């Protein structure tokens, strides 16, 4: 192994959780490194590019109050902002925005690059160096070694990821990335209990192929009513696009019921951290 650096904190994964963990540690003065499989997926939102909503919107504001990045990033990159549950009492009003996922990624990447005490590495972590019950460092797929005082695992769906498309299934992560299978095996070897959760993502539909006249338009709130997530956002905010609602029908129900008879093998119990 080649010794490549020494840090107080190493964060594995640069999604929502990893970004906030690395940023918080660095801002508190810890020499921090964040590792990601690819720099192009920092803050990537491959499934649903929205921030906030019921319960989750509360969490975004708490992160912002603690000096986090998600709220201000959402304010800077949103396409549509809408306060949910306006027909109910104010206690359940929930702010939700649809973001421009590419701009969100670029905003987050730039923010991390400007964070003092923080270094970004594009590398796959395959093994933890554990000595006498304590983590002393991490090892990359290319044999690089980084010593550290603690490690934050924030790998999300990359850890032991498996993709199911109909009856086909293969190892992989979101948006064509590969699964971090080596780290999964290493954590198992260290006695870490692992469990895999399952999610479903609908196929993307090309905008030009949609007949929007058949859908219900759902505009965002008027600009004068828009509220930011972040206490640090002071610029005027403007909605840019409408959203649309579609409904299922007996034909789509039949497709779902017919496909429900297809048996997919039991997923391996892997980790989602």
Please describe what each predicted stretch is.
Residues 8, 136, 149:
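Conserved acidic residues
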Residues 11, 21-25, 135:
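Conserved phosphate-binding elements of NTP-dependent enzyme cores
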Residues 20-24, 147, 270:
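Residues within well-formed alpha-helices
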């Amino acid at each position: 192994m080649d010794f490549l650096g020494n840090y107080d904190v190493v964060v594995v994964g640069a999604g929502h959780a990893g970004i906030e963990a690395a940023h918080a540690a660095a801002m508190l003065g810890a020499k921090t490194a964040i590792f990601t499989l690819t720099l192009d997926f920092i803050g990537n939102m491959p499934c649903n590019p929205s921030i906030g909503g019921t319960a989750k919107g509360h969490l975004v504001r708490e992160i912002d109050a603690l000096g986090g990045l998600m709220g201000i990033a959402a304010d800077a990159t949103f396409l549509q902002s809408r306060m949910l549950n306006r027909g109910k009492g104010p206690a359940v009003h929930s702010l939700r925005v649809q973001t421009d996922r590419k701009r969100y990624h670029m905003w987050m990447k730039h923010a991390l690059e400007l964070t003092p005490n923080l270094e970004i590495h594009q590398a796959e972590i395959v093994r933890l160096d554990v000595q006498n019950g304590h983590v002393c460092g991490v090892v990359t797929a290319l044999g690089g070694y980084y010593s550290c005082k603690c490690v934050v695992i924030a790998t999300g769906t990359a850890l032991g990821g498996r993709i199911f498309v109909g009856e086909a299934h293969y190892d992989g992560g979101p948006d064509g990335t590969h699964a971090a299978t080596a780290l999964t095996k290493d954590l198992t070897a260290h006695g870490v209990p692992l469990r895999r959760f399952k999610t479903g993502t609908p196929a993307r539909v090309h905008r030009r192929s949609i007949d929007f006249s058949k859908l219900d338009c759902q505009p965002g709130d008027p600009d004068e009513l828009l509220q930011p997530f972040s206490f640090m956002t002071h610029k005027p905010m403007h909605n840019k696009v409408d959203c649309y609602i579609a409904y299922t029908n007996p034909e789509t129900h039949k497709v779902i019921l017919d496909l429900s008879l297809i048996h997919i093998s039991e997923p391996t119990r892997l980790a989602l951290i």
